[in-house]
Amino acid sequence: MINPLRGMKDLTFDEAQRFVHIVKTAITIAKRYGYSYIETPILEETALFKRSVGDSSDIVSKEMYQFEDKGGNDVCMRPEGTAGVVRAFISAKLDRQPVKQKFYYYGPMFRYERPQKGRLREFHQFGCESFGEASVYEDFTIIIMISQIFQALGIGFELKINSLGCPECMPPYRQNLVGFLTEISEDLCTDCNRRIGMNPIRVLDCKNEACQSLLKQSPKLIENLCEHCDTDFKKLTVLLDDAGIAYEVDTNLVRGLDYYNKTAFEFVSNEIGSQSAIAGGGRYDKLVEYLDGKPTPAVGFAIGIERIMELVQMPETKKEGYYMGAMIPEAIEKIIMLGNRKRATDKVTVEYSSKGFKSHMKGVDKANARYALLIGEDELKNGTVWLKDLETKEEKSILLSEV
């Protein structure tokens, strides 16, 4: 028997229903905020992610499904969604238009990492990207939108926020951080030591518990922000306070991607074990320019669908549609034709073999249908059908032409 590859899985039955419910709910709310759908390829040039996510990130250095295709091109399966959306934004020359653009997307992402609960090698994300708005009000609005998605899904969360500064306040902070990290380098892991020279901010994202303990004493960027970044971050906290959204300022929150600046945030849940992040995002005002587009401020987020699958409060399923069945072989074609006609307006389950009454009623339950419609010998002779409403328990005989 051929099984799914390690770290990949099929979505069936209850999980598939949860997946669809999550995506539909998120789309409904995203549309209220003016987002429209965008689809980007799963396969992209590797250079896209090296330039955006960053060479020193775990994603690029350790986790990408990267290979050379038959044409000799260096390609990879997308490990995240933002870079592809930004590339598409530039390819369509939308960076040259004066209007603001907002897109939502959902689909599979791929990272070659150790599979564990809530973390697969193929996983799905729902994300939104907003282009052309530099105001911190947009950061706040996106956080509110995510909170509304989780509230609609019945998911509790905690919000963590931080500011990653800008090109003005980052260089002096980086210098202070390198000095601190150099002093404790002997006690840091190999990855952290490698990052000190390449991208010291990445050290703050280390998941090693020993490193995390040492990093609690590291210089805090939030205490070294320029006036503009400091004003924006304080404004964000005031807006969240006024909206009644509880949050924690996490000074070591840097996200796992190099393109973020200013606002960074994560939504976490204590109900899914150590992999507690269920959504994350932030501002990336330089990414469009890094990828050869016109300078365009932007902010976005992604929700890990598998991460929240078990947390979703599913709505009660209601009986809907019709179950149609024949009680004699001669009525099967009548049932099939009737079912095809009725599907123009309703959900219809048709049983293709003739069965007894009890067997058909079991089929009605299995299909979770509201209406049972059967044709037996008498009904076929009289040009009628037997119809029962499973909610009101009313049953009657009606003409075929009235169905």
From Swiss-Prot:
Catalyzed reactions per annotation: tRNA(His) + L-histidine + ATP = L-histidyl-tRNA(His) + AMP + diphosphate + H(+)
Documented EC number(s): 6.1.1.21
GO cellular component: cytoplasm
CDD domains attached to this UniProt entry: HisRS-like_core
Annotated compartments: Cytoplasm
Alphabetical keyword list: Aminoacyl-tRNA synthetase, ATP-binding, Cytoplasm, Ligase, Nucleotide-binding, Protein biosynthesis
Signal sequence region: none
PANTHER family noted in UniProt: HISTIDINE--TRNA LIGASE, MITOCHONDRIAL-RELATED (PTHR43707:SF1), HISTIDYL-TRNA SYNTHETASE (PTHR43707)
Family: Belongs to the class-II aminoacyl-tRNA synthetase family.
NCBIfam families: hisS (TIGR00442)
HAMAP family associated with the record: His_tRNA_synth
Protein name: Histidine--tRNA ligase
Gene: hisS
